[in-house]
Amino acid sequence: IESKLLSEFWGKPMYLGAHVLLPEGFDEHPEAKYPLMIYHGHFPSDFGGFQTTPPDPGMDTTDYSSRFGIYGYNKIQQQEAYNFYKQWTAPSFPRFLVVEIQHANPYYDDSYAVNSANLGPYGDAIMYELIPEIEKQFRGIGQGWSRFTYGGSTGGWEALAVQMFYPDEFNGCF
């Protein structure tokens, strides 16, 4: 979306984006409204960790990950992504929207999701422009009790920051 708040701050059109993972059965239940799980990361290009097919059984497992000290890491990663897909589409899995926010600024791929003197009102733009638009388009519940935020690395700090700066807009973070 084009952000009015950020465009005014920067003096040119500025945009916020998001990837939205819809729950299984979204189209079959047009009356349903959903809670949001909002992920903070560094400008994700897509939903990593989500794969609709299992890994090739003949996939090479001689690759070594020094970070984890194991062989076959790529196959493990693909298997876990497929396992997540199977869970996500299972009848007993809870239904919610997963949102990955894209909030690049002119200097970096991440605004840190807060208002600042040098980058502008990114926190307010995300909270009061982007999230309501997502909830409108994808039938979010639209209440603070129905939103949860999380992230890894810097995104973890961002999740904590938005929970602190917008305590009535989120029901928790990790």
Label every PLM stretch briefly.
Residues 1-174:
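Non-catalytic cap/lid and distal C-terminal segments of serine-dependent acyl enzymes
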